[in-house]
């Protein structure tokens, strides 16, 4: 399964986290976020895929960040349209959706065959990083073909919940606020312990 850690900014923290063998690392380029990345860190990850998170940014702004930060994947976390997402090809694109109930899953249909991945997050007061989970059983109603990552308040005590969750399209999890010492500063030890406990038993 894919392990994505989002909301990274500190160079030393990035370097330490990369050593854990995670797969994707996210950086947030939305100025209203407490994890906003305003300048290129002194160290950028080299052995993981770099994910840039954008919220209703312009096409020009996204392309500039992709080039400046050498991003591998673009995550759209706002109200971006299917046409906007399609215009970002050939880059890989994640479209995030805030989920509270089955009705919220209907919005995914317009993006099928356009984006590469979905990310299902908790519907909260702010965009991402709320630290709250939604009812994952809602995702039983998702019958799309696009693979997705499970997000929203996954924390150190959720190993069993992650193990127990099964969906044929779920390919990974997204970790953020509940593993933080401060905004954009991850507790690498707790992430290591979580991954050790999770081990490779999920989806075997």
Positions of predicted regions on the chain:
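Conserved N-terminal beta1-alpha1 strand-loop-helix module at the mouth
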Residues: 1-204
């Amino acid at each position: 399964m894919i392990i994505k850690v989002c909301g990274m900014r500190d160079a030393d923290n990035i370097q330490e986290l990369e050593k854990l063998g995670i797969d994707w690392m996210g950086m947030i380029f939305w100025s209203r976020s407490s994890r906003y990345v305003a300048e290129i860190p002194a160290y950028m990850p080299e052995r993981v895929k770099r994910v840039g998170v954008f919220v209703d940014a312009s096409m020009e702004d996204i392309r500039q960040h992709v080039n400046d930060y050498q991003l591998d994947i673009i995550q759209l976390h706002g109200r971006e349209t299917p046409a906007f997402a399609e215009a970002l090809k050939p880059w890989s694109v994640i479209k995030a959706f805030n989920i509270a109930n089955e009705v919220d899953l209907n919005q995914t249909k317009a993006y099928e065959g356009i984006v590469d991945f979905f990310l299902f997050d908790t519907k909260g007061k702010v965009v991402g990083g709320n630290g709250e989970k939604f009812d994952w059983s809602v995702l039983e109603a998702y019958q799309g073909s696009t693979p997705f990552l499970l997000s929203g308040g996954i924390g150190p005590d959720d190993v069993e919940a992650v193990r127990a969750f099964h969906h044929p399209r779920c390919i990974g999890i997204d970790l953020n606020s509940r593993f933080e010492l401060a905004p954009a500063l991850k507790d690498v030890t707790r992430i290591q312990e979580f991954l050790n406990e999770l081990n490779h038993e999920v989806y075997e």
